[in-house]
Amino acid sequence: MQSFADAKEFFQYSAGQWQSRRVTHHLPFRRAESGGSNIQVETLEKDDPRIIEICQMHDMDASLSVGGSYVTWAGTMQWDKDDENHEGSTVFALIPDADNPRQGKLLRERGYAEIVPVAGEYHLDHEDGLVLTTEYETMTIYERFWFANPDLRLRTSTVKRFGGFNTTTFCMEERIQTSPVTATAAAETNPLYAISGW
């Protein structure tokens, strides 16, 4: 199991290209839907113009950010109609709490559920999983991310809307291309483990 000092390390470790497979359970309909996507994660330093811009967008002092990520995705879901697409991109900026680098605010230029700027709360739990809570106008999304091994990241999410749980999702994300930063981190953490192997 990977160990992280803070969320910045977690996102740096996530840098690279991922292939995601997921199953979403639509609880009111008692039906499940499968899907997949390709995800690209790029690490951004705190002085990156995109990080500064998103902090300004949220009226936050950019000097408080430790950096973040630029994420792009393209995918499909089983119930998609012809005119639906699941492509997009977003910038994450991390603002850790002053007294605890393992928790803080995660700023986005757009959310997944609503295409508006959104701020979530994050923390690393006792197993070094990243827990993210994001509140939108009509719903709250709870997510947990963790690494089963350096090339396999798992994610669960629950959407709560109008006082009840609407959907739950389980994702298995397999790394198909790493970044130099991630490869170095993996070699230091697991010197006998091949980053490209199982």
Curated annotation (Swiss-Prot):
The alphabetized UniProt keywords are: Lyase
- Provide the phenotype resulting from gene inactivation: Cells are a yellow color, 70% reduction in phycobiliproteins, grow slowly, have an increased sensitivity to high light and a long lag phase. The C-phycocyanin beta subunit (PhcB) in this strain is missing the phycocyanobilin chromophore on 'Cys-82'.
Read off the Pfam families from this record: CpeS (PF09367)
Q: What EC number(s) would the UniProt record show?
A: 4.-.-.-
Q: Does the keyword Lyase apply?
A: yes
Please identify the protein, giving its name as recorded: Phycocyanobilin lyase subunit CpcS
**Record-linked CDD domains:** lipocalin_CpcS-CpeS
Enzyme class label: lyase
Q: How is this protein organized at the quaternary level?
A: Forms a heterodimer with CpcU.
* InterPro entries the record matches: Calycin, CpcS/CpeS
Q: Which family does it belong to?
A: Belongs to the CpcS/CpeS biliprotein lyase family.
- BP GO terms, sorted: protein-phycocyanobilin linkage
Q: Which molecular function terms from Gene Ontology are attached?
A: lyase activity
* Organism of this sequence: Picosynechococcus sp. (strain ATCC 27264 / PCC 7002 / PR-6)
Report whether Transmembrane shows up as a keyword of the record. no
Instruction: State the function annotated in the UniProt record.
Output: Attaches a phycocyanobilin (PCB) chromophore to 'Cys-82' of the C-phycocyanain beta subunit (PhcB) and the unique PCB that is attached to allophycocyanin alpha and beta subunits (ApcA and ApcB). In vitro, and probably also in vivo, chromophorylates ApcD and ApcF.
